[in-house]
């Protein structure tokens, strides 16, 4: 590697809002606080929420359905 062009890496502690802590190397020199990590993210934990798209469509139709029907009739 060329001298003087690469940033210095430091070992830092990353702290998640769930309380999980781990060490990593980064160009940052101070601890890092994050909101989501692999211990609490739904993709990694398998506890994903299923979005009720049918309920959203029904809610949209209830709210705007009358207006859309009036436009279709004219």
UniProtKB/Swiss-Prot annotation:
The residues the record assigns to binding Zn(2+) are: 16, 18, 37, 40
Q: How and how many cofactors are bound, per the record note? A: Binds 1 zinc ion per subunit.
Q: Which cofactor does it need?
A: Zn(2+)
Keyword Nucleotidyltransferase part of the UniProt annotation: no
Q: Which UniProt keywords apply?
A: Metal-binding, Ribonucleoprotein, Ribosomal protein, RNA-binding, rRNA-binding, Zinc
Record carries keyword Ribosomal protein: yes
Example GO BP: translation
Q: Which InterPro entries match?
A: Ribosomal_bL28/bL31-like_sf, Ribosomal_bL31, Ribosomal_bL31_A, Ribosomal_bL31_sf
**Would you tell me the Gene Ontology cellular component terms?**
ribonucleoprotein complex; ribosome
Q: Name one GO molecular function term.
A: rRNA binding
| Complex and partners | Part of the 50S ribosomal subunit.
Function of this protein? Binds the 23S rRNA.
- What's the family? Belongs to the bacterial ribosomal protein bL31 family. Type A subfamily.
Q: Which PANTHER family match?
A: 50S RIBOSOMAL PROTEIN L31, CHLOROPLASTIC, LARGE RIBOSOMAL SUBUNIT PROTEIN BL31A
What name does this protein carry?
A: Large ribosomal subunit protein bL31
The species this protein belongs to is: Nitrosomonas europaea (strain ATCC 19718 / CIP 103999 / KCTC 2705 / NBRC 14298)
